[in-house]
From Swiss-Prot:
Residue numbers spanned by region Disordered: 301-351, 372-435, 464-524, 575-623, 703-729
Tissues in which the UniProt entry reports expression: Highly expressed in testis, placenta and ovary. Expressed in breast. levels in the placenta increase over the course of pregnancy.
Motif annotated as Non-classical PY-nuclear localization signal (PY-NLS), chain positions: 717-724
Annotated effect of mutating residue 56 to C: Reduces deubiquitination activity towards H2AK119ub1 substrates in the context of the nucleosome
EC id: 3.4.19.12
InterPro entries, per the entry: Papain-like_cys_pep_sf, Peptidase_C12_UCH, Peptidase_C12_UCH_sf, UCH_C
Record-given protein name: Ubiquitin carboxyl-terminal hydrolase BAP1
Amino acid sequence: MNKGWLELESDPGLFTLLVEDFGVKGVQVEEIYDLQSKCQGPVYGFIFLFKWIEERRSRRKVSTLVDDTSVIDDDIVNNMFFAHQLIPNSCATHALLSVLLNCSSVDLGPTLSRMKDFTKGFSPESKGYAIGNAPELAKAHNSHARPEPRHLPEKQNGLSAVRTMEAFHFVSYVPITGRLFELDGLKVYPIDHGPWGEDEEWTDKARRVIMERIGLATAGEPYHDIRFNLMAVVPDRRIKYEARLHVLKVNRQTVLEALQQLIRVTQPELIQTHKSQESQLPEESKSASNKSPLVLEANRAPAASEGNHTDGAEEAAGSCAQAPSHSPPNKPKLVVKPPGSSLNGVHPNPTPIVQRLPAFLDNHNYAKSPMQEEEDLAAGVGRSRVPVRPPQQYSDDEDDYEDDEEDDVQNTNSALRYKGKGTGKPGALSGSADGQLSVLQPNTINVLAEKLKESQKDLSIPLSIKTSSGAGSPAVAVPTHSQPSPTPSNESTDTASEIGSAFNSPLRSPIRSANPTRPSSPVTSHISKVLFGEDDSLLRVDCIRYNRAVRDLGPVISTGLLHLAEDGVLSPLALTEGGKGSSPSIRPIQGSQGSSSPVEKEVVEATDSREKTGMVRPGEPLSGEKYSPKELLALLKCVEAEIANYEACLKEEVEKRKKFKIDDQRRTHNYDEFICTFISMLAQEGMLANLVEQNISVRRRQGVSIGRLHKQRKPDRRKRSRPYKAKRQ
């Protein structure tokens, strides 16, 4: 295995795929574009590329130069993973292994775990031999390299090909035991750059060291040389975004519970009204189904013609009768319309029907005064409600990511471990769980109850709100949150790293550009219209900033779980060192072997960060407050905006992985066979000679010197020099 290792490009997509081939999980590689800016998030290590000064790396030996920064203590050197590079062109794998095997919080997989255990306590030279004799590493290394160019014939070896090619080398910067080390496989000892400051991260010191090195190599002009590249080994951002989505969906459920509990406390008489209305619904639906004909819904016709039956049609039908079960599946679904209703849901009677909310909501309309409500009632002002088709749910067709999603589905139940007290007992559950939100009349109290019950089944499905509907009341379906719509952006995959990096990328992703940070939520806007009669104040982000619930809970809504007490107090969940919540009602279930879910890790990390910034004191329970319905709706809008934002980020990461694989296929594909076959076919057809002559003639007409034409300049110089000498005489 000492020969045959190929050169690798300094590309974050290549290194990310190489990490996956090594069997490492939860790690990716990002490119650093700006050394002046601070790195966001945890970083396992840096991989630095620079130009190598020697001519031939195949004949080089490990440098024996030792200075004051070299660590010569065998105990320190052997306890870390530092290996001499004994195989040419293996510096990329050496640099990557130097980062991964010196990090204790990385899932290395079977291959690297076995190597780490086997080489524990070995000398750097022995570790170098272990890397060179690992066929799994060599196979993964060469699988991402460009095809090796063919050697030139011996008669054309006048110029050394090695002298004309520039050689580059990879080294690593890793934090080990509180000190920054530079691990270079071509040096006999690791380089110790010392500890970093108390008020800074290790990445800050590493950036300073790298900038000083670039400045020395370029004579004090660090931005005039592009022969350097820097990459960071970071956690997989897909896992981070999925964990944040789990936390946000649990918090959305908690906010809905708080809103439902507030309505139950303020209006206890509504429960009796709800029961009486439920008893009347079967009779009304039965009479309506016997009198009304079967008609096709206009807004469901395109989807039904293709045979795609959506649950939204059943949800819009409400309590009406369904189509017969013996109907073929390729026929459009028929629904029963109430008497007098048209295809568009508009009553044919010219007299407008006043659509009002239930009495308990109209009496507690916080957006209007009682005088204004009486005027609206006298004028017959109704709220128009138009069905809105939900957007297509996000799905990833990538094969390898589907495997990851299967593991994530198993971990979905981890979000259900956090269950707050005071969960209301909803009524009968409707049969639809399609992830839509329907606000029907007149039982708005069941809106939150049905949505909570559906969300407890599967947190990965967008939560829905469902209420019973009386005859003649139109159904309104609104998606739970605004999904990121794919934009007609440039799908070129020539350079997948152009999609952008989390570390100061100069190019912004088209997905993020198409989605604002805080998109307007159709759920909260529609609920605010139903509850309060207006949504202008909730749609403005500036007004949300000054909302009390958003101001108190907004900074921790995506990093920590919310706890709803029995008295309606909503507060963030404080975690102790053991990872268990201070509230007895919300406790994470400890898994086997002490493993924790991504949700628990995210919550612990978020709590630690809040303790560092002074937001939370260790061991101190977090105080909560009661909020008004309008404040809870603003908080719900904030949660759904964060969900939409993280879903866009997750989709961006998935698309970036896809383009990484496309680039890798283009990089590793051998085009020589196709080129040789094409040229041989041209020669067989007698077209090759003519094409060569045409190419040569075009170059001559363009003034390009061919062959020995440039040697005619010497006689011209002698002719010009003779008159000059004669004039001097």
